[in-house]
Structures are given as structure tokens and as C-alpha cells.
């Protein structure tokens, strides 16, 4: 069977088809999977851009790995990237370095709230948000997204407003674009969220780490770009790590236009000791944003091809499967993570994922981790060579065929 990919690049400069052996590299993704094919945690099976590898090699060859500063060139790299790619003009002074988006979020939950206050999240959503809230003495307040049963999520505005209006709710963590459902929030939606949070005195943390991994032809809207209210009442978390597959290098930024809020966040990150770069963080960030854009464009096209192939394979499977064993792929235009509805088969995908890993040697993320109606879903990472993705889906289909929820 051949598939025509809508975003196939006929003459690629970069290789995304060759499998790279990650054994011996202490990879979380592979070590946790054991003998299973790992299609769970969100890192990619591609070497990072050669421009980044060359810069890191040069830094490595220097041989001295002492303490690092954050140079003005780091701020400027973010400013130039967001202006060029996302039409957002960032004040360099509004950027603060952090060792990661998650450490920054956890630190801000501690500093911007008092104990037992509510932090609102829109579920199903990135599971580590729950950890950042609970581990820092606050309460998770879920405003579940509405699911129409046929592949589309939307915001329950009445529920969102009632929960933001609770005086105990002081912080909202927004996922933009949204992981795991892959939704790119449009400007009107973000404006309405911003207005509600402003009216009810709720600060917004916008996690925008997936912003550069949109399908070709689709652009995300930075929360801070929507209007002055959104800008002055928010902290935006941004990083090159998801985009360029360098999560292990621990480099990120928070962008805070409001100087009063910025000082609080700066104090939080420094108090928690997550504001100093390691010896490779600056080198990797500068090479990513200043030199690696062509690699990213080819990556996005390749990922879009993978997603198109995944949809074609699911359609082919469904055409031959019994109705009670069919699955549905959620429509999405961001991230390399697919959110797959398995509710016809089971309402406990933890059991399904266990079966798939044990009996068919493929590992996905069980949806219940993400809250909301996630128990009906699995999350599949397709950032891998197409042949590996195809093998993973064939194992999935075999597992769906012989799964029993009893």
C-alpha cells in the first residue's frame, strides 16, 4: 500500500528516515519501555539539527566546563525567533532564563500562590501540571474540555468562568498549543480566556513549548500577543528543547512583560536555584534559534507526513475492524503527539496500554494520566522514522484485535 503524503519533501537536506540506536545513552524513553517499542514520552527519535551538534562539539572540544552566564545574545535569539516566526515583539528585558519549563512552572506555583489555593487546568492536559500543583501545596481545579465524541474538543465556557470566579482560584496554567489534544487555540479563544482571568484576578502561566511544532500552514498565537491584558497578566514559558529534541540539555525561558510580576518570577526561579545555565545551554540555544531553522522546516514536513500516514493506517484498520474495536484519531494541527479515542473498546486505557506493552511490545501513554476524559484515550508519539511508526501502529492494531477488557 502506498500513501501520498501532503507534506512530502522530495529533496530533503536532512535525514529523518534512519533509525538511531539509543541504547547505552540512559534514555528514559527506551529504558522504561524495556523490550517494547517506545512511542510514549515526548522526545524524538531524530538526531538534533547538525548545526546544534557542530556547535556543541566545538564547545565540548574546548574542554573546560565551568559556570556559565546568560549573555545578551541569548535574549536576542529569542527576540529574533519570535518576531520572525510568530510575529511577537518581545522586550529582551522581559526574558528570564530557567533550566526547564517544568521547573519554572513548579517554582511559579510556589511563589505566586498561597497554600491550598486553586490552580486551574483544562483537562485532559499535560500530566506534569498535576505534579507541579499538588507538590507545591495547591489544589488542582479541573475545567474539563468538552468532547463532541467525533474528534473535536472545545472549551466549556460556563464551567471555566465559574471556576475562575472562585476567590480561591488564583492561577491558571494554559497549554498553548494544547498537549495532548493537539489543539491550536485561536486568537478569539485566547482573548476570552485572558478577559476572564483579568476580570477574576487570576494570573496565567502559558506553556508554549510545543509552539514551533505545528503542521505546515498552521501557526500558533502567542498568548501575550493577543492584547495588553493578556500580556500584562501572564508568564509565557518557551524553549528550544521540544522543537529541536534537546530536552536533556535543560534550557528554557520565561517571558514576563509585567515588571512587577517579572520580579516575583525572577525571585522564584533564583530562590529555587533553577535560573543558572549549564555549560551547554547557551551554545545549544543560540545554535538552535540562529542557525537551525531550515532543519525545523523539514522536520515539520516530515512529522506532517507521519501524521497523515497514521490517519491513513487508522482508516484502513477501521474499515476492516468490527465496530466495537474501532478507534478515532482526534483532529489536531500541533505537536507530534496523537490523541486516540479507544472508548468503543474500553473506558480504561490503562488496561489496554498494559496489554499492548506486555503482549505486543509497544508502549504508549495511557490517557488517564491527563485527567478529564483521558481514560478513554491513548497518546501516541509519532516523532520517529516512518518505518518505525508503521511498525508501532501494526503492533497497536494487532493488540486492539485481541484485547479483552475483562
Spans of model-derived segments:
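Conserved glycine-rich beta-strand-loop-beta hairpin in the small C-terminal domain of fold type I
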Residues: 286, 302-311, 329-342, 374
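Conserved core of the PLP fold type I
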Residues: 65-195, 212-213, 220-225, 229, ...
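PLP-dependent enzyme catalytic core of the Aspartate aminotransferase-like
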Residues: 230, 346, 354-364, 370-406
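Helix C-cap/helix->beta junction micro-motif
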Residues: 136, 199-200, 230, 360
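Conserved core segment of the aminotransferase class I/II
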Residues: 54, 228-304, 400
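N-terminal small-domain helix-loop-helix segment of the aminotransferase-like
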Residues: 8, 12-100, 107, 288-291, ...
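Single conserved hydrophobic/aromatic residue that forms the stacking wall/gate
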Residues: 1-9
Amino acid at each position: 500500500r502506498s500513501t501520498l503524503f501532503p507534506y512530502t519533501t522530495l529533496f530533503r537536506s536532512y535525514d529523518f528516515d534512519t533509525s538511531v540506536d539509543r541504547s547505552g545513552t540512559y534514555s528514559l524513553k527506551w529504558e522504561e519501555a524495556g523490550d517494547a517499542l517506545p512511542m510514549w514520552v515526548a522526545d524524538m527519535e531524530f538526531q538534533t539539527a547538525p548545526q546544534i551538534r557542530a556547535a556543541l562539539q566545538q564547545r565540548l572540544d574546548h574542554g573546560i566546563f565551568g559556570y556559565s552566564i546568560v549573555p545578551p545574545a541569548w535574549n536576542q535569539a529569542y527576540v529574533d525567533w519570535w518576531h520572525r516566526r510568530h510575529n511577537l515583539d518581545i522586550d529582551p528585558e522581559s526574558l528570564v532564563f530557567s533550566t526547564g519549563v517544568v521547573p519554572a512552572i513548579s517554582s511559579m506555583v510556589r511563589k505566586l500562590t498561597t497554600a491550598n489555593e486553586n490552580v486551574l487546568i483544562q483537562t485532559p492536559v499535560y500530566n506534569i501540571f498535576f505534579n507541579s500543583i499538588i507538590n507545591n501545596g495547591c489544589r488542582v481545579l479541573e475545567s474539563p474540555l468538552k468532547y463532541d465524541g467525533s474528534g473535536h474538543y472545545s472549551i466549556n465556557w460556563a464551567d471555566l468562568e465559574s471556576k475562575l470566579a472562585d476567590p480561591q482560584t488564583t492561577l491558571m496554567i494554559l497549554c498553548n498549543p494544547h498537549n495532548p489534544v493537539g489543539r491550536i487555540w485561536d486568537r478569539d479563544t485566547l482573548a476570552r480566556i485572558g478577559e476572564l482571568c483579568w476580570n477574576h484576578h487570576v494570573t496565567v502561566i502559558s506553556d508554549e513549548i510545543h509552539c514551533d511544532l505545528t503542521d505546515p500552514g498552521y501557526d500558533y498565537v502567542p498568548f501575550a500577543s493577543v492584547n495588553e491584558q493578556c500580556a500584562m497578566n501572564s508568564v509565557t514559558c518557551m524553549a528550544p528543547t521540544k522543537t529541536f529534541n534537546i530536552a536533556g540539555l535543560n534550557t528554557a525561558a520565561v517571558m514576563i512583560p509585567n515588571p512587577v510580576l517579572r520580579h516575583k518570577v525572577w525571585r522564584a526561579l533564583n530562590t529555587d536555584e533553577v535560573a543558572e545555565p549549564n555549560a551547554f545551554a547557551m551554545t545549544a540555544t543560540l545554535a538552535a534559534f540562529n542557525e537551525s531553522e531550515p532543519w525545523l522546516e523539514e522536520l515539520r514536513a516530515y512529522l506532517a507526513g507521519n501524521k497523515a500516514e497514521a490517519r491513513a493506517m487508522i482508516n484502513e484498520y477501521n474499515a476492516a475492524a468490527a465496530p466495537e474495536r474501532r478507534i478515532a484519531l482526534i483532529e489536531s494541527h500541533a505537536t507530534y503527539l496523537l490523541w486516540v479515542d479507544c472508548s468503543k473498546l474500553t473506558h480504561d486505557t490503562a488496561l489496554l496500554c498494559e496489554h499492548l506493552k506486555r503482549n505486543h511490545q509497544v508502549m504508549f501513554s495511557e490517557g488517564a494520566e491527563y485527567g478529564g476524559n483521558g481514560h478513554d484515550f491513548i497518546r501516541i508519539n509519532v516523532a520517529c522514522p516512518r518505518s518505525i511508526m508503521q511498525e508501532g501502529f501494526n503492533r497497536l492494531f494487532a493488540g486492539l484485535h485481541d484485547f479483552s477488557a475483562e
